[in-house]
Amino acid sequence: MSENSSDSDSSCGWTVISHEGSDIEMLNSVTPTNSCEPAPECSSLEQEELQALQLEQGESSQNGTVLMEETAYPALEETSSTIEAEEEKIPEDNIYIGTASDDSDIVTLEPPKLEEIGNQEVVIVEEAQSSEDFNMGSSSSSQYTFCQPETVFSSQPSDDESSSDETSNQPSPAFRRRRARKKTVSTSESEDRLVAEQETEPSKESKRQFSSGLNKCVILALVIAVSMGFGHFYGTIQIQKRQQLVRKIHEDELNDMKDYLSQCQQEQGSFIDYKSLKENLARCWTLTEAEKMSFETQKTNLATENQYLRVSLEKEEKALSSLQEELNKLREQIRILEDKGTSTELVKENQKLKQHLEEEKQKKHSFLSQRETLLTEAKMLKRELERERLVTTALRGELQQLSGSQLHGKSDSPNVYTEKKEIAILRERLTELERKLTFEQQRSDLWERLYVEAKDQSGKQETDGKKKVGRGNHRAKNKSKETFLGSVKETFDAMKNSTKEFVRHHKEKIKQAKEAVKENLKKFSDSVKSTFRHFKDTTKNIFDEKGNKRFGATKAAAEKPRTVFSDYLHPQYKAPTENHHNRGPTMQNDGRKEKPVHFKEFRKNTNSRKCSPGHACRENSHSFRKACYGVFDCAQQESISLFNTVVNPIRMDEFRQIIQRYMLKELDTFCHWNELDRFINKFFLNGVFIHDQKLFTDFVNDVKDYLRNMKEYQVDNDGVFEKLDEYIYRHFFGHTFSPPYGPSRPDKKQRMVNIENSRHRKQEQKHLQPQPYKREGKWHKYGRTNGRQMANLEIELGQLPFDPQY
């Protein structure tokens, strides 16, 4: 060995040289004297083993096979068993002895035999297979460093080789370590070294055997260490890979679980959504079914309503065509009248009628004054009757005295018997006179109420009175000779004369009443005639305003506004020449002109208590429907013509509320709501007033009359219902309504007298007037009345509803 310290361990022909600061120059095996050189063989064996290890490492790295930690230990046991078998096979004489040079510090291992080399190659290949992954120069499991030796093939032996090398025919590879500083070896020194080696061979054989065993142990330890390091390293890698694999598997499982949970949540949410959608669909289905049913019902209802409207439209078209025809006829009639030039004549007649109206008013006032005088005369007659009653009572007392004196006288004489008879006759006459007095008293009372009431009864009493008076006169003449009855005779004569005077006076009053009634009838007919003539003139201006200019009418007549009531007032208007010979039931008997009485105000007042939607009201509105069509049209025309405002049809609930407000305002209590509702309901159809059948102003007047005729409000009512119509008109139309032809109501005192007189007059009409005609002609169809109703009308109305300005 040289100065530099070097450590060398050898086993199985391997020489491990550890030298600091020197390079490997050559590794030669030490050859015995009688054998071949072992160094080249050993070096070639090492080279082959290293190549095999590298090949195995390359294959293992290419295949990428992963061995478990448990496989390292059987491989280690297999390698140890193969090494022991090789040791048994190798004889002692085949042990190579390594030579070491003191100068170069090179230890040369003698190469083994070829067979051993083959066995060693197999073992080394197996070891290399077990430790292929750890030949990476890492010091984690071993402190040794393996490096690939350089094989040097020398074709010619160098000069400085030993004699044993010269004898060798084959070149041998060897590991070389080159040192930093190299000593030159002379031939003499090499020879000396060989000689010394040969001398020390016997002593080193024992060392060689020991070193070979030691090398085996070292190799075994190295193999064990390498295998343990490989196993440890591979185990750690496998554990890490397993851990990574487990983590990856856990992560995958967690991801799968998350995906599954999210999918389950989505499925659950979709299931809930499906349920809600199903419920919504069911609800929508039910709603669509209900809507479909309602649509079908509505469709059927609309179809029926459409059919009904078509039928009603056809009817209305027919009615409209008929109305248009009637309108054309009326226009033709108006044109005919205009062509004849009757407009100026009508104006003249109207002026004459106004003059007659003034005269009639004066006569009416005189008639009222005469009636007052008659009432005062009736009171005077009542007083005279009281006086006559007192006289009769005095005569009765005298008769009783005379009868008593005659009874106390002689009863057997024949004169007494005759006197008794005369007394009995006088008593009978006295009772008759008393009966007459009581009757006359009753008749005078009736005369105070109404002087026309007892016409037939007074006639009967006149005849009865004449007969009884005749009897009394005959008996008085026969017995006038009697002296004791002279005073009685005088009293009876006075009574007879007074009764005759009373009857005569009463008869004269009855005649005067008849004449007053006739005169009243005449006045009434004349006033109606004047009114008719006036409206006749106004109807001419409705359809053609130019007619007045063409025929020279007055400016006032031309400027009069058109009204819808002209057609209502004259539904059957014709020329006077055409209808002059067709007025049978309504002509007057005194040869005067005809007097049409078709006027709304009078008919309304006469039939206000008997009006019903089925009879009188329809008669009132028969001609009004010619001027308007339908409830709305008639209501608007009436409101425009009377109040200059457009109003919709009056509703029943609104009208009832107005009546209730007025009653609560004017009266403390009103107990006839049910009766009033029954009366009002007759004039409303489906809650709306029948404007096409009756005028609303007429209806208000009917309600007013109905309330006045109640017994509770006939006397001492202080005019509670006087302002009812104004209150109703103010509510519906904004202002009150003033009748265009003067006041339609008398004053309060006159109205009370008229109401009381009308009651008794109705009783008298049952006896005085004949039965009405069963068929009164065509005028009765449109509300015409007979003469009896016309005669009573003035008494009920009091002051006539006319004004001289018209």
Swiss-Prot record:
Transmembrane stretches, start-end: 217-237
Residues annotated with Phosphoserine modification: 186
Task: Please state where this protein is localized.
Answer: Cytoplasmic granule membrane
Positions of the region Disordered?
80-105, 152-207, 457-478, 758-778
List where Basic residues composition bias occurs: 175-184, 468-478
Which portions of the chain have biased composition (kind: Basic and acidic residues)?
Answer: 190-207, 457-467
Membrane topology, from the record: Single-pass type II membrane protein
Q: Which InterPro entries is this protein grouped with?
A: CCPG1/PBIP1
Q: Looking at the record, which segments are called Interaction with MCF2L and SRC?
A: 1-307
Keyword entries, A-Z: Cell cycle, Coiled coil, Membrane, Phosphoprotein, Signal-anchor, Transmembrane, Transmembrane helix
Q: In this UniProt entry, which residues form the Lumenal topological domain(s)?
A: 238-806
Coiled-coil-forming residues are: 305-449, 503-529
Parts of the chain on the Cytoplasmic side: 1-216
Q: Does the keyword Phosphoprotein apply?
A: yes
Its quaternary organisation is: Interacts with MCF2L. May interact with MCF2, ARHGEF1, BCR, VAV1 and FGD1, but not with TIAM1. Interacts with GTP-bound CDC42 and SRC.
Give the UniProt family note. Answer: Belongs to the CCPG1 family.
Q: What does this protein do?
A: Acts as an assembly platform for Rho protein signaling complexes. Limits guanine nucleotide exchange activity of MCF2L toward RHOA, which results in an inhibition of both its transcriptional activation ability and its transforming activity. Does not inhibit activity of MCF2L toward CDC42, or activity of MCF2 toward either RHOA or CDC42. May be involved in cell cycle regulation.
Q: What is this protein called?
A: Cell cycle progression protein 1
Q: Which organism is it from?
A: Pongo abelii (Sumatran orangutan)
Its lineage opens with: Eukaryota, Metazoa, Chordata, Craniata, Vertebrata
